[in-house]
């Protein structure tokens, strides 16, 4: 899969920009841009750019091809798990909705047309191992998101059972905060909270088993969900990518450490060496950090989905 032109920001005349996130640009698709046989409803064009964020700050340097790799990993998992949970993808090709004069090749592997859904205002996180903010919470309280865990667990230890630990959904530049299930119920209601929790753990277990067959441990992952006008629940945005998940090479896993992962760890490690206040604007990245980060995303795509990047 050759990498096409690097894309830091997408601008598509005629498609109203709905949201520009840390990585994705989301556009409304006017009805007259849709194919005549498109089912009734509203649709979005979601573009995965090559932007990279760290510590909730979007950095000035892109990772070439990152958006394409993220999109392909997401699409792989959306199709792999559609027997478990409906997702936001629809059968409308990207080139059918792009404005005239826009090169379809630039967007073919980094964009998707999706249903327009009402987002559930909570991040849905599944954890199978004790790491990251969960490890910090456990050290301080013996719990994660109000869930009592056994005493004496070590960093990166596999949990007795996967757990659901929701968090707030912060705006770009702000930080998500872990909340307990009761707080989620107060936000979205008991029935929807239970559906999201059950779907999150169901997908996580399936994905963790599949990843293990590829020699990869899925330590934790974050999902976003949305509902349609009839209240049907969908998984949306991205799915089980190296940006939303913590993947560890199984042969490098070591209890009591923070194992290496298929993500932007090289970037975080480099930034920790700088005298930078972790606020915008972010610093530029050396070429070797960019190259090594790109290689990690490419390896994850190859090992999970069998898709090679030239």
UniProtKB/Swiss-Prot annotation:
EC number of the protein: 6.3.2.6
Catalytic activity from the UniProt record: 5-amino-1-(5-phospho-D-ribosyl)imidazole-4-carboxylate + L-aspartate + ATP = (2S)-2-[5-amino-1-(5-phospho-beta-D-ribosyl)imidazole-4-carboxamido]succinate + ADP + phosphate + 2 H(+)
Recorded metabolic or biological pathway in which this protein acts: Purine metabolism; IMP biosynthesis via de novo pathway; 5-amino-1-(5-phospho-D-ribosyl)imidazole-4-carboxamide from 5-amino-1-(5-phospho-D-ribosyl)imidazole-4-carboxylate: step 1/2
GO molecular function: ATP binding; phosphoribosylaminoimidazolesuccinocarboxamide synthase activity
Claim: Ligase is one of the keywords in the record: yes
Gene3D superfamilies cross-referenced by the UniProt entry: ATP-grasp fold, B domain, Phosphorylase Kinase, domain 1
UniProt keyword annotations, A-Z: ATP-binding, Ligase, Nucleotide-binding, Purine biosynthesis
Gene Ontology CC: cytoplasm
InterPro entries in the cross-refs: SAICAR_synt/ADE2_N (IPR028923), SAICAR_synth (IPR001636), SAICAR_synthetase_CS (IPR018236)
Highest taxon of source: Bacteria
Single Gene Ontology BP annotation: 'de novo' IMP biosynthetic process
Family: Belongs to the SAICAR synthetase family.
Cited NCBIfam families: PRK13961.1 (NF010568), purC (TIGR00081)
Protein name as catalogued: Phosphoribosylaminoimidazole-succinocarboxamide synthase
């Amino acid at each position: 899969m050759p990498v096409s032109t690097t894309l830091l920001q997408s601008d598509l005349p005629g498609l109203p920009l709905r949201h520009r996130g840390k990585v994705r640009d989301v556009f409304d698709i006017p009805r007259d841009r849709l194919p005549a046989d498109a089912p009734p409803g509203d649709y979005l064009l979601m573009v995965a750019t090559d932007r990279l964020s760290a510590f909730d700050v979007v950095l000035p340097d892109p990772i070439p091809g990152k958006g394409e790799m993220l999109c392909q990993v997401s699409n792989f998992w959306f199709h792999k798990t559609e027997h478990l949970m409906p997702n936001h993808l629809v059968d409308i090709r990207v080139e059918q909705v792009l404005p005239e004069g826009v090169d379809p090749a630039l967007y073919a592997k980094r964009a998707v047309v999706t249903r327009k859904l009402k987002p559930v205002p909570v991040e849905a996180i599944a954890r199978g191992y004790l790491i990251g903010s969960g490890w910090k919470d456990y050290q301080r309280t013996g719990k994660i998101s109000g869930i009592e865990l056994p005493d004496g667990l070590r960093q990166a230890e596999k949990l007795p059972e996967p757990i659901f630990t929701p968090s707030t959904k912060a705006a770009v530049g702000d930080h998500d905060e872990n909340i307990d299930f009761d707080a989620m119920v107060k936000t979205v209601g008991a029935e929807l909270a239970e559906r999201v929790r059950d779907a999150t753990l169901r997908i996580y277990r399936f994905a963790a088993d599949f990843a293990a067959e590829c020699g990869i441990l899925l330590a934790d992952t974050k999902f976003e969900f949305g509902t349609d006008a009839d209240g049907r629940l969908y998984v949306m945005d991205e799915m089980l990518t190296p940006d939303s998940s913590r993947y560890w090479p199984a042969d490098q896993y070591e209890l009591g450490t923070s194992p290496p992962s298929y993500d932007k760890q090289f970037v975080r490690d480099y930034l920790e060496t700088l005298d930078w206040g972790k606020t915008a604007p972010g610093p530029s990245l050396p070429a070797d950090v960019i190259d090594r980060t790109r290689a990690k995303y490419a390896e994850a795509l190859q090992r999970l989905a069998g898709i090679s990047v030239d």
